[in-house]
Amino acid sequence: MAIAESFKVEDGFSVLAGVVARRDGTVEAVAVDTATVGGTDATEAAVRIAERLLKPDVSIIMLDGCVVSFYNWIDGEALWRRFGVPVACYVFEDPEGRVEEAVKKLFKDWELRIEAIRRLGWPTPYYTKSGYKIYIRSWGIDPADAGRAAELCAKFGKWPEPIRVAQLVASGVREYLSRRSR
């Protein structure tokens, strides 16, 4: 299972999409939810998606990033503890490390946000057999095993297919909702 999001600051909301897919990439189920851009509710949106999609044969929850929707966040440990399914958060570009500076400038509740983001931990680099470098935070699974899980279902480049499809769904739904609200 994978969860990805799409947002534009001016919309005020982000769309999170969850996809259940088999290892071969065949999509079995999709669910969507929303979170607030710059809010603190992305974990709750991810929980609602997981409640709708999780089945006994889902072996991992893959997150396309943990800091989402303009410094909102998904707490991978909370998902793991709630559902008992390993959670891996993937970052496909080098983490910049300037998150704390930006959060302090942008938010009155910056201390809460920085504490939550620090609790996520620093991602571990993982090198795929194809030579890609991805960064992984994980709960209930070793980062190297989470990296191998991502490789097993990657069809194009470094992105696991369930994450790629979840990104497409989230983007399409966000575009639709954004156009409707104009």
Swiss-Prot record:
Signal peptide: none annotated. Transmembrane segments: none annotated. It comes from the Archaea. Belongs to the UPF0215 family. This is UPF0215 protein Pcal_0119. It comes from Pyrobaculum calidifontis (strain DSM 21063 / JCM 11548 / VA1).
